[in-house]
């Protein structure tokens, strides 16, 4: 009888687990819920598509991240998550185009694809949708992380009137709030600033320039840009005495809080499914 009892308990647990797994939504169903709740028209074409795995797979857990690096994928697997929702590309280009890398048998790509396949991961990109939401979910997350909601000037969510500080002190505050390890400064670090323009990610020179023109800021804060475009433009503005400084956060640090915001937003959309925010580590640090 003891042997029968020892067998009966694990079988019962297995049956319960199988039942729970069978009732879990598929990856495709999760994404459909996200699209429905977001309530924005899908861009055509869009990069918000499945990048790997089977959309019919039952979801055990969701890992939300800024960028699905191999490090992030490993941490997702450790948590038991099999659906990864990433803001940025998985395979090194905006549209995750694999043609050249596969034709050249790229070894880095091969390792990543094998890991994804071995662990039956499903990867979906969430980029165009959050930026199309009103307000932009990624920007809103950053503003919340900085506690700048009340600092927005005249409803322009890229222009802020901030407490009096210096460029250096502001850079340190941003690094602490956003988890950036290698913030860069241009201009006089001790310059006193009271207004800022903030553009996350990589919106490009035209968008950055227009924000600067609208805001006439003391300091410009960006994620990243080509050094011969926004960087040079702001350097010239500093030399001309029009701007006091610039802070470059890095792309990941400048948008990561937006995906943390998305993870919070997602939990009530998929009740009963674990949603983990798995931050992407800042790839840079300073050499001392």
Language model features: what each stretch is:
Residues 1, 16, 20:
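Nuclease and nuclease-like effector domains acting on nucleic acids or nucleotide cofactors
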Residues 1-8:
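Bacterial N-terminal signal peptides that target proteins for export
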Residues 8-16:
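Bacterial N-terminal signal peptides
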Residues 21-288:
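Active-site catalytic microenvironments in core metabolic enzymes, especially phosphate/sugar-handling
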């Amino acid at each position: 009888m003891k042997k029968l009892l020892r067998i009966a308990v694990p079988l019962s647990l297995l049956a319960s687990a199988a039942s729970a797994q069978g009732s879990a939504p598929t990856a495709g169903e999760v994404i459909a819920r996200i699209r429905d709740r977001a309530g924005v028209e899908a861009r055509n074409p869009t990069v918000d598509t499945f990048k790997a795995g089977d959309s019919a797979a039952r979801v055990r857990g969701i890992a939300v991240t800024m960028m699905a690096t191999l490090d992030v994928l490993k941490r997702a697997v450790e948590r038991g998550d099999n659906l990864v929702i990433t803001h940025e590309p998985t395979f090194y280009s905006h549209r995750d185009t694999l043609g050249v890398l596969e034709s050249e048998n790229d070894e880095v790509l091969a390792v990543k694809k094998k890991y994804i396949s071995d662990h039956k991961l499903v990867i979906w990109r969430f980029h165009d949708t959050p930026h199309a939401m009103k307000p932009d979910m990624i920007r809103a997350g950053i503003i919340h992380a900085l506690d700048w909601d009340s600092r927005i000037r005249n409803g322009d969510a890229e222009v802020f009137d901030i407490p009096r500080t210096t460029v250096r002190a502001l850079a340190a505050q941003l690094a602490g709030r956003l988890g950036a390890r290698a913030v860069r400064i241009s201009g006089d670090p001790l310059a006193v600033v009271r207004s800022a323009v903030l553009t996350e990610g990589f919106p490009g020179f035209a968008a950055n320039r227009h924000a600067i023109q609208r805001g006439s800021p003391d300091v410009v804060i960006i994620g990243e840009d080509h050094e011969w475009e926004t960087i040079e433009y702001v350097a010239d503005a500093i030399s001309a005495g029009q701007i006091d400084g610039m802070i470059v956060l890095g792309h990941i640090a400048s948008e990561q809080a937006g995906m943390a915001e998305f993870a919070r937003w997602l939990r009530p959309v998929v009740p009963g499914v674990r949603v983990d925010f798995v931050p992407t580590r800042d790839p840079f640090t300073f050499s001392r």
